[in-house]
Amino acid sequence: MPRTQRNDNFIDKSFTVMADIILKMLPANKKAKEAFVYYRDGMSAQADGEYAEALDNYYEALTLEEDPNDRSYILYNIGIIHASNGEHEKALEYYEEAIQLNPRMPSALNNIAVIYHFQGEKAREDGQQAEAEALYDKAAEYWKQAIRLAPNNYIEAQNWLKITGRSEIDVFF
């Protein structure tokens, strides 16, 4: 049974009803509508922690979706799942691909920065200070880009940039 027919709670039911209304109202071709159904089911499965099912739906949506902006969000969600599973290199690939399609996606930029910062922390713990600093610098570059796009977000990142001397005057408003 498709996930959209297994609405177990009010939020899922509401989301499904709204999504179905949007699908009927938007002037989209059959392929785009089918891609959206897979994307919607992927988001629902992801919210339930059913990552394998979510990935299956997202991959199917990718085969159908042609719009670059919509594809960027599918790729972003795939990246989130891989990051959640500790597959940071895979997550980075999907986030980068999402940014290629949609450069104005601060959440993907932030997530890339978080991964590089995490890797920097691990390198520091392993006594690899030069590697840690290089990873921190990468994190800083991505956080600066995210902050430029969403200056009121990522306050902790802004503070980290200031504390570590990696901030620039033009980043903060």
UniProtKB/Swiss-Prot annotation:
It comes from the Bacteria. InterPro entries: PSI_Ycf3_assembly, TPR-like_helical_dom_sf, TPR_rpt, Ycf3/AcsC/BcsC/TPR_MFPF. It is a peripheral membrane protein. SUPFAM superfamilies: TPR-like. Its main location: membrane. Signal peptide: none annotated. It is found in: Cellular thylakoid membrane. The keyword Thylakoid applies. TPR repeats lie at residues 35-68, 72-105, 120-153. GO terms for biological process: photosynthesis. Coiled coil: none annotated. GO terms for cellular component: plasma membrane-derived thylakoid membrane. Keywords: Membrane, Photosynthesis, Repeat, Thylakoid, TPR repeat. NCBIfam families: PRK02603.1 (NF002725). Essential for the assembly of the photosystem I (PSI) complex. May act as a chaperone-like factor to guide the assembly of the PSI subunits. Belongs to the Ycf3 family. This is Photosystem I assembly protein Ycf3. It comes from Microcystis aeruginosa (strain NIES-843 / IAM M-2473). The lineage of its organism: Bacteria, Bacillati, Cyanobacteriota, Cyanophyceae, Oscillatoriophycideae.
